[in-house]
Amino acid sequence: MQGHVSILSVSPEAAAMIASGGRISTMDGTADEIYAKSLAAGQEKNEKLIGKVLSSGHTSVLEHCYVNLSFENVSVLAEQFLIEFRLASFTVKSRRYDVFSRAGFVSPDFPDDTQKAVFEDTVKSLFGIYDALEAAGVPKEDARFVLPYCFCSNFFCSMNARELVHVMNELAYGRGSRIPELRTLGESLFAQCEQQLPFLAVRKPEAYRQPDGFCPRPVQLLTSNAPVTVLAAPQDAEGLICSAYQ
């Protein structure tokens, strides 16, 4: 089963609101006056300003825009990967109340049919155990622990636009890029932003070219023989340690 992600809704007048955040720190006028000017400026002019502000590194203005997403029939692995992003809100179809034996599952691309058959037989067996436990009176909230992480999940997710840019890049270029399902979700979000919110389609592949996906570490942190200097220590350190056990 192939899952997908959809942008459901965005803050009203998103470009005008973000552009207002970019204007207020340098433009004369009250907050209401600046917002009115942004509305009057129009989409094209606001998007041009947003691009200029973002290119200067002031990405916090994106936080004035909120985006609501739906994830349909994605794996629980994808669900849990996304829930790691704590600057977002999630509401997930509950495994405590809904029956998931017929939820379907996401199957990886296998190099041969034998591996695929073993995988699918194993998953179907786990679904069968889940059904058997429920039929035996085991509560759903306990039976759910035998479900595989590939079974399909559905949930809503809301986050500010700055976090969305971060999430899209993590999916397309960061840790998520190693898993085809996650990389596909990231590319889908970028494609939707390019159509609906072009100022959010900010790709940052260069940020992930380091081996660990972060900025280069200082050389001294990578050197195992780097010197360590003891700045201070108690006079009788050994005595203090021994007294703690007497």
Predicted segments with their positions:
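A conserved ligand/cofactor-binding region detector
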Residues: 1-246
